[in-house]
Amino acid sequence: MAKNKIRVRYAPSPTGHLHIGNARTALFNYLFARHNKGTFVLRIEDTDTKRNIADGEKSQMDNLEWLGIDWDEGPDKPGKYGPYRQSERKDIYKPLIQELLDKDLAYESFMTEEELQAQREEQKARGEAPRYVYEYEGMSKEEIKKAQDEARAKGLKPVVRIRVPHNKTYEWDDIVKGKISFLSDTIGGDFVIQKRDGMPTYNFAVVVDDHLMEITHVLRGDDHVANTPKQLVVYEAFGWKAPEFGHMSLIINTETGKKLSKRDETVLQFIEQYRELGYLPDAMFNFITLLGWSPVGESEIFNKQEFIKMFDAKRLSKSPAAFDGKKLEWINNQYVKAAKEDEIMDSSLRQLIKAGKVQADPDAYTIEWARKLISLYKQQMSYTGQIVEMADVFFNEPPVLSEDAKKELADESAAIVLKEFAERVKDLPIFDAVEIQNTIRSIQKDTKIKGRKLYMPIRIATTREMHGPELAPSIELLGREKALKHLKQTLEEMN
């Protein structure tokens, strides 16, 4: 490997779909690699077979690609450091576990889960932090071997634990948080590096993989801080150099003020959910990049290449990042407004079809009608899924008039405007936005009613709303029959 060549990785477990927090981890590693002309590795940590879900790996990869995050090495892009799934690396871990056993840096432990639980309960009752207490304390090598043989004869399967040195400080200069240190006696005692089924634990496999894949920097979430001293124990046991670590701040839900938790249903947290609602990938990329990292200056809208160019890990924040759904909507709206018509058309039409508002295989007339409808709302949409609710009046029976709307129609001029409008549009030879606008102007000219008193009654009567997109095109899309029906209904309600 070239000297100082940066290699980073994103190493998800296929136990669920791509979470916002995990997407941020992937994104920051990607930006760090691209900014420094390094290598970005995708590695699947699938040793927790009980929690893996069928499409977990596919979901991770599909959604990373959707966000615009591409990797240089991974399960689908093999390199010289593979395999890139931990489940395919068992033959790599086994001899290394054995090496530690042979050097007496690790040992087999036969304590059952029940015994370990009882030990923890006793410690808790004494007000002590739970920790593993060495089960062979005071025993000779011969006595230990005898105890292990007897346990094996009973059919018990061992775990392998690594020896944690006593009263030793493990510290590192964290890229985000600065100096962090742990006393070895506070990390829970000798910890498991191989489970009873022969699979390595996370804190062992991750060290082996990072070392053999020559990972130089590990950027990950704040929840991994407590894992780092354990991993440093493993690095030390093998005499390997550890990479640089950086632990990114927590993400806080602005609605609750609490840490973003997968159990928190007050906010959508998975990339799939935002895709389904019609958020744009570039907008999500932009928003997520600002969760715990800030550019120089006041601007917040940047494209991917701009983020790559200016990304500096020193600007990763120590303070919690605020997940603000309103800000995400604002950012996405900026991207919707700037996007090409075809992109928004395709995404919005899918939303209308999914909601059953438009047939699954629309004909040319329906597509053209939908194109005009979507264009009408493009500037207002925070995400394309909003088209379904925003354009509800075009698909469903008109809603009951609000009290504010009724007040607007209380002026006697409203009835004059609506009767004139209904009479004139009924016989329009061409029912389109131009002719509708000309009709409104002619009413103004003939009645001398203008401004809000002219336009608001027509908007309320036809669209049943007080606010919305441009009026004449909206009425054109409603169609003559529906517009006249709404006008008649409104006039009846006014009487």
UniProtKB/Swiss-Prot annotation:
Source organism's superkingdom?
Bacteria
Is this entry keyworded Disulfide bond?
no
Question: What is known about what this protein does?
Answer: Catalyzes the attachment of glutamate to tRNA(Glu) in a two-step reaction: glutamate is first activated by ATP to form Glu-AMP and then transferred to the acceptor end of tRNA(Glu).
Name where it's found.
Cytoplasm
Highest classification ranks of the organism: Bacteria, Bacillati, Bacillota, Bacilli, Lactobacillales
Say which species the protein is native to.
Ligilactobacillus salivarius (strain UCC118)
GO biological process entries: glutamyl-tRNA aminoacylation
Q: What is this protein called?
A: Glutamate--tRNA ligase
Q: Which GO terms describe its molecular function?
A: ATP binding; glutamate-tRNA ligase activity; tRNA binding; zinc ion binding
Keyword terms of this UniProt record: Aminoacyl-tRNA synthetase, ATP-binding, Cytoplasm, Ligase, Nucleotide-binding, Protein biosynthesis
Short sequence motif 'HIGH' region: positions: 12-22
Which residues are ATP-binding? K262
Entry EC number(s):
6.1.1.17
Matching HAMAP family, A to Z?
Glu_tRNA_synth_type1
NCBIfam families membership = gltX_bact (TIGR00464)
The gene name on file is: gltX
CDD domains named among the record's database cross-references: GluRS_core
